Amino acid sequence: MPLEVVVELQIRAISCPGVFLPDKEVVYLGVYLLNQYLETDCFPSVFPIVIQQSMRFEKVFEEAMDPGAVAELLESFLTRFELVQLVSPAWEELAYYEKNTRDFLFPEPKLTSSHLGMQREVLMKTAIWFPGIAPKLEFSTRTAILECVFPCKNRFLWEERCKLQQSFSKLNGPANNRKKKPKEKNSDQLSKGTPFWGPSPQRLHLHRPTQRNPGKSFRFLGERKPPFVVRHVDSGNPFGENNLEHHSQKSRRKPKFINFDLAKKRAFSLDSLEANIKVVREPDERIVLRSQSPPPLNSGHFRKPLLNHQGDVDFHPETTVTTSQLSSPPSPLDHSLLQERFQPCSASMWQKIQERACSLLTPNRAHPKEDSISETNSIHERPSYLLRKHLLREHRYF
C-alpha cells in the first residue's frame, strides 16, 4: 500500500535583537515544504515578529512500501523559509533558510535539545543589504508516516478499483462453489447409479442406441414389432426375398443389437422365426396359375439365394432345407391344395393386399428377374407336407 507523510508545522516567532528595518512596510513568512507553498499573515516590520500560526503539509508516495524508502525519497525534496517585505513596486526578500526535507524533519540529535522537534531554532541567511545580524526562526514540527488507502490525487480512480475488486471477488466466490457442487453431485450419482445400468436389459435396449445415434431413435422403437407376422406380397418380388436380404443386411450392420432383440421379437410374434419365414415364402395364386408348365430347372439359379443369406446365421437351417427340397419333383397335391386355399379370397381382397405390400416394400431393393423366376420354381416344387403342416397357422393372418 502507498505511504503518506503528514507534517504539522507550528511557527512561533522571528527574533532579531537590535535590528531596525529601513522600510516600514509589512512583512510575512513564506514556507515551501513537500512541494507546497504556504504564507503567514502580514505583520509590522518590527522585531521580534510574533507569528503563532500552524500549517499542515501532506504528501503521498505511491511507490514507497516502507518508511525507509520514504526517508530516502525525502532527501530529494527541498524545504525553504522566506522572510519577505512588501516594498513598492514589488516585494523584497530580507532573509531565507533552506535544507533537504529529510534533514529538516528528522535532524540529528544534539546536546542542547531536550525535546526533539518540539522547540526548534534555526538561523536564517540574510541578504547583502540587510542591516544587522541574522534573524532567528523559532518553530516546532511533528511528522507522521501513515498507510494511505487511496492516493489523494487519484482518489476517485482508486475507489473505483476497490469497488471492481470487491465485485469481482463476490462474483467469483459463488461461481467456484457452484462449479464444485455439480461435480460432486455427478460423482455421487455415478457411484450410486452404475450398479443398476448393467443387469437391466430394458435400459440397455432404450439407452444404448440413443447414445450412438440419437437422431434415429424412432427407427429403433419401430423394430419392436415382429417383421413377418402379416403376409405381404409384392408383384415384383412375391416371395419376400427382398425382406430376407434386407433383414440380413440389417443384422450385419447392427450385430450387437440383433442378438439382444431376437428374444423380444420372438415373444411378440405368434410363431417362431422359422415358421414366419415359411409363411412369407408361400406362393401367390397368380404365380401358381402362371407356372402350370414350369421351365426346366437350372441348378445355378438355386445357389444365388444361398449365397445371399450366407452371412446370416439365423437363416442357415432354412436355406439348407429349401435346397434339399428343390431336388424332389413337384407333387400334384400342391396345385389342388393351393387352389382350394386361395379360392375363398376375392380379387378385391388380393388387390388390397398387393397395394399394401407395395406401399410397405417400396424402399427395398428389387431383385433380378432370374432370381424371382428361380424362386417361383423352387416354391412350386416344394413338397406338400410343409403346406399341410402350417395350414392352420396361415389362416389366422388373413
UniProtKB/Swiss-Prot annotation:
The modification Phosphoserine is found at S269, S272. One of its GO terms (cellular component) is sperm head-tail coupling apparatus. Keywords: Phosphoprotein. One of its GO terms (biological process) is spermatogenesis. GO terms for molecular function: myosin light chain binding. The keyword Phosphoprotein applies. It comes from the Eukaryota. It holds the Pfam family SPATA6. Residues 170-215 are annotated as: Disordered. Belongs to the SPATA6 family. PANTHER family: SPERMATOGENESIS ASSOCIATED 6-LIKE PROTEIN (PTHR16435:SF5), SPERMATOGENESIS-ASSOCIATED PROTEIN 6 SPATA6 (PTHR16435). This is Spermatogenesis associated 6-like protein. It comes from Rattus norvegicus. The lineage of its organism: Eukaryota, Metazoa, Chordata, Craniata, Vertebrata.
